[in-house]
Structure formats: C-alpha cells, structure tokens
Regions:
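Membrane-embedded alpha-helical bundles that constitute the cytochrome b-like, heme-associated redox core
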Residues: 1-149
Length: 149
C-alpha cells in the first residue's frame, strides 16, 4: 500500500471513529463509547506517526522563525489539537474508573473529558478546513475542476 493511500485510509477511519464516539452513548452503551474512543485514539496516534516528518520539519522552522503566517496558524491549531486530544484521551481513560463504581457518578475527569472532546471536535473542523487543499490533492481533486452535469 502506498503512502498516500495509507494516509487517506487512516484519516477516513479516524474521522469515522471520531464521529461514532460522539454518538449519545447512553443510548448505546458506555462500552461502545470506550471501544470506539480507543479505536479513534489508535488512528490519532497513527495519523501523528504518518505525519511525523512534517511535524518535525515545521516545528524546527517554527522555532527558527521561518514560517509564513498561514503555516504558523496551521501549526498552532495542530499543536492545540495534540494537547486537547491528549488531555481528552487521558481523562477518558481516567474517567473509566468511576464508571466501574456506579455510586461514584460522573467524576471531574469525566466532565473534563467531555469538555476537551468538544473543544477537540471544533479544532478538528478548523484543521480540516485549513488542510482542504492537501485533502483535495490526496483525493485527486484538481484545482478549479468542475463537475460534469
């Protein structure tokens, strides 16, 4: 499998599992949310691994002061995504413990998990919008191409 195809597959699966993780899990089950969230975490880690060279190069350029404004904003959003989703993932795993004890109710960790997940989702939307040219390129959409009627 080539690199471009791997990127597309990982990104599509990550988005699918991310959307599924926002399904009202009370209607399905906590186990469903935990499994889907864990799968999303796996694809998130794969996404970072696949793009590690870009991350390293842009980080180096950022600290050297060599980034243009647009790339600097992409980098800021990407780093916010990394921090917010890392907190969401960590608090998601910590929040499992009170759920094992039904009397404990929703913990501070569960609330923090929910808040960071929603912030993370908003940042994902911004991230996708910022990277639309690359996404279109991966999907083979030509710039200025019009659909045939």
């Amino acid at each position: 499998m080539n690199s471009r195809r791997a990127k597309i597959i990982v990104d599509i699966l990550m988005v699918i599992f991310l959307v599924l993780s926002f399904v009202r899990w009370e209607a399905s089950s906590f186990a469903f949310h935990a499994i889907v969230g864990s799968a999303c975490t796996l694809f998130f880690a794969m996404h970072i691994f696949i793009h590690r060279k870009w991350i390293k190069a842009v980080t180096k350029s950022c600290f050297a002061g060599k980034l243009n404004k647009a790339l600097r904003w992409k980098y800021i959003i990407d780093m916010l995504l990394l921090v917010v989703w890392s907190v969401s993932i960590l608090t998601g795993f910590i929040a499992i413990i009170p759920f094992l004890d039904e009397a404990a109710g929703i913990s501070v960790w569960g609330r923090l998990h929910g808040i960071t997940a929603r912030i993370g989702l908003a940042l994902v939307v911004v991230h996708v919008i910022q990277h639309l040219p690359q996404i279109k390129s991966y999907l083979g959409v030509k710039k200025g191409a019009k659909k045939k009627s």
